[in-house]
Amino acid sequence: MAYRKLGRTSSQRKAMLRDLTTDLIINESIVTTEARAKEIRKTVEKMITLGKRGDLHARRQAAAFVRNEIASENYDEATEKYTSTTALQKLFSELAPRYAERNGGYTRILKTEPRRGDAAPMAIIELV
């Protein structure tokens, strides 16, 4: 299987991909280097496909990869409590139904100007 090393050890690379995948699920658009964006695309596509399957096994597989971060927090005035949704809940309740009719190709990579300082090629990766 071909992949990019991204100048990191395997555990550092896996942690970075988990973090960036979770951030993309939460924010639906992030700015990163072009090489990282191309690697994130693979993992995000797999996570959304797991979300579309929606069974217990798919939910557990996605939970093993996606970080347990809060995606949004709302205040309910009637009960005077905060309700929050995690990245995993957003994946299964919002993103999976949105892409139910689409067979792959859930992300878009837009190249931007090089980063100031080291001229690394930058890109915006976003959900379609």
Swiss-Prot record:
Q: Would you name any one GO CC term? A: cytosolic large ribosomal subunit
Kindly list the GO molecular function terms attached to this UniProt entry: structural constituent of ribosome
Listed A to Z, the keywords are: Ribonucleoprotein, Ribosomal protein
The Gene Ontology biological process terms listed for this entry are: translation
State the oligomer form and interacting partners.
Answer: Part of the 50S ribosomal subunit. Contacts protein L32.
Q: Hey, which family's this protein in?
A: Belongs to the bacterial ribosomal protein bL17 family.
* Cited PANTHER family: LARGE RIBOSOMAL SUBUNIT PROTEIN BL17M, RIBOSOMAL PROTEIN L17
Q: What is this protein called?
A: Large ribosomal subunit protein bL17
Q: Which organism is it from?
A: Streptococcus gordonii (strain Challis / ATCC 35105 / BCRC 15272 / CH1 / DL1 / V288)
